[in-house]
Amino acid sequence: MRGSFMKIYIVLGLLISLAIIFLMIYYIPSTDDLSPDNPFFNGLSTFVSRYNVSRISISDLDKIGVGTIVFLIGPDKNFDQYDAARVRDYLSRGGIFFIADDYGTSQELIDLLRINISLYRGVLRDPLLMYKNSYLPRVDVYIGRETLHLYMNYGTAIDISKTYEGSCIGYSSVLSFLEIYEGSNRTGRKVGGAVMYII
């Protein structure tokens, strides 16, 4: 009799433990970088809730209406001609397509769209104006009369030296630099002029 009660207690203990684990998984938010469910500094939950943002795939761009803004945030996939055609069609209908890239992953899409800029394959660092460490530099973005202080999460920079179009809206401090990845070596060499063009 006593052994059967022990089995019941063990089973109940396991069931309660599993219930607690599942509740913790359900209620603890995601901490993934750039996740729409992440409420921390490296997440997008405030952005998603404040601006009523919804997730879509590139194949759904033809369903998006005029007067919308699409953000491509932290891309991590290879792009092909199909993706570029969807983006090109969206842009031709008057859409705004904003690329927020880390490590220059979207260079392939930019090339397929025949835009004459290149993303540096490196990380913007700033030892002066930053959040917690130099890989999270502050960038001041000027839109109209408003200044936004953005903290880039392993951001990169744009090289527009081959084109005469475009303008810079975001600036890091004068002590910022690019850590360029060249094979397995990292270099802290200066690239380009004094202005950092930030995505």
Regions found by a protein language model. Give the residues of each.
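Short, surface-exposed patches at the edges or C-terminal ends of soluble domains, predominantly
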Residues: 1-199
